[in-house]
């Protein structure tokens, strides 16, 4: 663990990554001694309210985390940082974002869980912006200038005050991951969560932790008192939501969208819920131990794209089977008016035979609230996400580039990832194309 005392003693000269979390109320001046080397500065979980004017002297700084501090506005000095491209003000007290306070080279901007009611017109100048996290604010509309953000691939708009979504949003040429649940436009939809069986925390015993995501922690558990209406094994999985708001939106929306999605052979089956003042949780069937995560989450460098262990390999036949299963699952979701919003290898479980299970509806959205044209465009956006998944998997099939199967997958990938949403294939068409090559 890095400490302020060690920083002041000169121990950290020439380091590239610094993390300090000591309830700081003022920016440590000693950090400027690292201006020629520091690339990542993590000052999350402090009590900072401002940055000094000299902050622009951090010439090599690329990544800045100011999560869970007390900022009420974004310091304008950030715009003068020449290499700064990833910025997080998650969980602060931001009520506004002023014009021209962000570096034009920003690629990844996290403003989740603040009180922002409007974005500045200057956000349209962020031509390199790929990832934008805005969930848990008070946005009523998006500035039209954002249609100039042609490199935007992922945007989280959940848990705001949006009444409509602009048509230009669905026409962004690289957009592949979009979430908008928990806005005013979604409140007209009748909740379906009441149809799910409810259980209490006393009905099961938690065991070991299985995993953790943006919205919750998953544990293995065993039924102590299984309701007679539930047909499941004694061993189950329990997803306990972390709080009222996550980076993807409201947990209650995840529950509703998960239920509306219905059952499919490749979806992790949901069997019950816990809804109380103390806790919100989802009860799911336990995934067999032979399944493992297909990929790892994006890194600070890859931004929107998943990462993979160096040892990861797949045959083209396995890739076809996985992508075919995913395309058919997404066909099912969109027929049930649900978009997933988080189509990634790291949310996908597979076994050695390329059998696939898919879950995590934290970024899902109810498409019933959209006009028909936007519903169709939303499918095109998720088709692009499927293309990105295929693009991530193809490099894992080493030395198979010249095979007919590989070339066929390349063509499908290019069709999925094309910029024009009006020319995008449907999931039904993709399923039929892939079946030819099984």
Per-region residue spans from a language model:
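Conserved hydrophobic beta-strand positions in leucine-rich repeat
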Residues: 18, 41-43, 64-66, 87-89, ...
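Protein kinase glycine-rich loop
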Residues: 207-213, 218
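ATP-binding glycine-rich loop module of kinase domains
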Residues: 217-257
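Short beta-strand micro-motifs within the conserved protein kinase catalytic domain, predominantly
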Residues: 269-280
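Activation segment signature within eukaryotic-like protein kinase domains
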Residues: 322-323
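Catalytic-loop of the protein kinase fold
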Residues: 330, 334-350
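C-lobe/activation-segment region of protein kinase-like
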Residues: 357, 362-415
């Amino acid at each position: 663990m890095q400490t302020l005392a060690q920083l002041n003693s000169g121990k950290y000269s020439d380091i590239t990554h610094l993390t300090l979390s000591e309830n700081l109320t003022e920016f440590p001046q000693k950090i400027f001694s690292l201006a020629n080397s520091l690339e990542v500065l993590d000052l999350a979980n402090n009590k900072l309210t401002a940055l000094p004017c000299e902050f622009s002297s951090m010439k090599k700084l690329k990544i800045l985390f100011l999560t869970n501090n007390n900022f009420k506005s974004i310091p304008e000095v950030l715009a003068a940082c020449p290499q700064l491209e990833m910025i997080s003000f998650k969980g602060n007290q931001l009520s506004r974002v002023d014009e021209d306070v962000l570096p034009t080279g920003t690629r990844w901007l996290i403003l989740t869980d603040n009180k922002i009611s409007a974005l500045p017109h200057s956000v349209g100048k962020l031509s390199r912006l790929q990832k934008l996290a805005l969930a848990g604010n008070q946005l009523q509309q998006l500035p039209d200038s954002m249609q100039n953000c042609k490199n935007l691939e992922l945007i989280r708009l959940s848990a705001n005050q949006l009444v409509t979504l602009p048509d230009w949003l669905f026409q962004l040429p690289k957009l592949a991951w979009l979430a908008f649940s928990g806005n005013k436009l979604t409140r007209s939809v009748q909740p379906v969560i009441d149809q799910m069986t409810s259980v209490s925390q006393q009905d099961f015993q938690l065991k070991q932790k299985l995993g953790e995501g943006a919205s919750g922690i998953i544990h293995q558990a065993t039924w102590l008192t299984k309701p007679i209406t539930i047909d499941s094994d004694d061993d189950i999985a329990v997803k306990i939501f972390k709080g009222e708001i996550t980076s993807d939106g409201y947990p209650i929306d995840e529950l509703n969208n998960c239920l509306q999605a219905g059952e499919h052979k490749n979806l992790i089956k949901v069997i019950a819920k816990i809804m109380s003042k103390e806790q919100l949780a989802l009860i799911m069937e336990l995934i067999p131990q032979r399944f493992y995560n297909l990929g790892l989450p994006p890194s600070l460098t890859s931004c929107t794209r998943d990462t993979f262990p160096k040892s990861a390999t797949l045959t083209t036949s396995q890739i076809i089977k996985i992508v075919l299963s995913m395309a058919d699952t997404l066909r099912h979701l969109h027929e049930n008016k649900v978009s997933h919003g988080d189509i990634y290898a790291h949310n996908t479980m597979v076994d050695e035979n390329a059998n696939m299970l898919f879950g995590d509806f934290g970024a899902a959205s109810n498409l019933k609230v959209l006009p028909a044209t936007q519903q169709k465009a939303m499918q095109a956006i998720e088709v692009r996400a499927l293309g990105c998944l295929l693009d991530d998997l193809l490099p894992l099939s080493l030395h198979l580039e010249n095979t007919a199967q590989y070339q066929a997958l390349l063509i499908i990938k290019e069709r999925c990832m094309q910029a024009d949403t009006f020319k995008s294939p449907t999931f039904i068409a993709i399923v039929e194309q892939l079946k030819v090559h099984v």
